[in-house]
């Protein structure tokens, strides 16, 4: 059995995305693949248990039969950090992880082990940072490096040093289109010169960085005034509608797959947003829209999200959400699979793993 730990240079760097697309490829190839997330950071109530939300989602995507309790045996909470800091006995985290992994790995050819947070740091308080987990489970390690700028090289090198000989190679993620040539012609050769094998670079993609209308409504604690069946629609761009209606119409028409954020008293901007194929309209200030706006949104099946906060606060909360985008919707999974098939050399990775 081969175990592959998937970690990243930063939180929200693309670990789950890589686990999903690699897991689906292995299943298409007829391999018996499993998924394991030793540390969970997203507690959620599922099937009357408190489990890691990411682990439960990936289990469903890969159609795995394993019990949720085994998929992510340790949930990282504030209480766990307090217990670690006060050196209270009885944590036994490494034993719990190793025992759950042994049960899950039985009969499997490959187990993908999802990391959390950033490779060099997350889990250190418990002695369960990425390298320690890879050693504990005897896994090779694949690093996902989210590209921010040329300085991203520093985080990659620090993570390389942390993983040591466990590292099998690197996948670069979220590379802007205008940086792809630099990455392929300069950054990748440099990384390979310093001993890091690169299996490809995924370009930035607006679908993968989008959020669903439902996710947006939940995060903003918004009341969905109409069209709740459109919660799965994906929003790629956000526009604050603070201009006059003529300028708004010109601007809105140039921006596809958008959400417009505007005051609840701006019926003119709301109607302009509805008439230019927006994915939703976010109304701020707890001001309900006019009956004309509600009727038109129902006719066009475009949700209206009513929020209590002012526009500036809502924009801040949306920006926070955009920095923590997760793969949840089927459209994102399909797009990620397409990009991986085009830009990643998974065959080379599997050869490195002896598969």
Which role fits each region the language model picked out?
Residues 115-196, 265-328:
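Conserved catalytic-core segment of NTP-binding enzymes
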């Amino acid at each position: 059995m081969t175990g592959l730990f998937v970690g990243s240079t930063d939180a929200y760097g693309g670990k789950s995305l890589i686990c999903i697309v690699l897991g689906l490829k292995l299943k298409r190839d007829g391999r018996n693949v499993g998924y394991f997330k030793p540390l969970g950071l997203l507690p959620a109530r599922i099937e009357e248990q408190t489990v890691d939300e990411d682990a439960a989602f990936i289990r469903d995507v890969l159609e795995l039969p394993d019990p949720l309790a085994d998929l992510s045996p340790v949930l990282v909470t504030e209480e766990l950090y307090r217990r670690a800091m006060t050196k209270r006995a009885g944590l036994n985290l490494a034993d719990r992880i190793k025992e759950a992994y042994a049960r899950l790995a039985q009969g499997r050819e490959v187990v993908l082990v999802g990391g959390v947070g950033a490779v060099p740091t997350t889990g250190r308080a418990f002695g369960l940072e990425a390298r320690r987990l890879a050693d504990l489970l005897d896994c090779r390690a694949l690093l996902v490096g989210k590209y921010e700028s040329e300085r991203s090289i520093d985080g990659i090198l620090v993570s390389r040093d942390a993983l040591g000989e466990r590292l099998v190679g690197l996948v670069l993620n979220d590379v802007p289109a205008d940086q792809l040539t630099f990455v392929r012609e300069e950054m990748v050769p440099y990384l390979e010169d310093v001993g890091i094998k690169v299996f490809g670079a995924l370009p930035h993609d607006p679908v993968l960085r989008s959020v669903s209308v439902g996710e947006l409504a939940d995060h903003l604690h918004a009341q969905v005034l109409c069209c709740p069946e459109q919660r799965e629609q994906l929003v790629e761009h956000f526009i604050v509608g603070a201009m006059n209606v003529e300028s708004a119409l010109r601007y809105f028409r140039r921006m596809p797959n958008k959400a417009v954020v505007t005051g609840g008293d701006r019926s003119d901007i709301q109607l302009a947003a509805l008439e230019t194929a927006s994915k939703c309209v976010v109304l701020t200030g707890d001001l309900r829209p006019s009956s004309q706006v509600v009727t038109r949104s129902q006719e066009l099946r475009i949700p209206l999200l009513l929020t209590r906060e002012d526009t500036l606060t809502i924009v801040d909360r949306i920006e926070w959400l955009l920095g923590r985008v997760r793969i949840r919707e089927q459209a994102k999974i399909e797009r990620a699979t397409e990009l991986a098939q085009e830009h990643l050399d998974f065959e080379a990775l599997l050869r490195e793993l002896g598969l």
